[in-house]
């Protein structure tokens, strides 16, 4: 599938596309959609509920040598970050 890409913080990233939760790979790196420096790494996916599950992306980043983690709804995560496809 062809995805639209742009250079964000010196990296080629997929823009204006929302991946299905099962397409988001652990270990993938995502650039900040606002163009600011840095990236986050997907650590995992959390699923809550069974009939209509709520899925969150668990991600991390480093700041001043310290690792931080957070989680966001899969849609909100992709509104803020773009999948890096080339460094």
What are these regions (language model features)?
Residues 63-87:
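Intrinsically disordered, low-complexity, charged/polar segments
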């Amino acid at each position: 599938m062809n995805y639209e890409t742009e250079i964000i913080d010196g990296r080629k990233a997929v823009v204006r596309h929302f991946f299905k939760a099962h397409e988001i790979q652990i270990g993938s790196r995502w650039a900040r959609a606002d163009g600011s420096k840095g990236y986050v790494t997907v650590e995992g996916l959390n699923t809550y509920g069974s009939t209509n599950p709520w899925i969150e992306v668990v991600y991390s980043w480093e700041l001043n040598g310290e690792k931080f983690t957070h989680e966001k709804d899969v849609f909100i995560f992709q509104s803020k970050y773009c999948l890096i496809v080339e460094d």
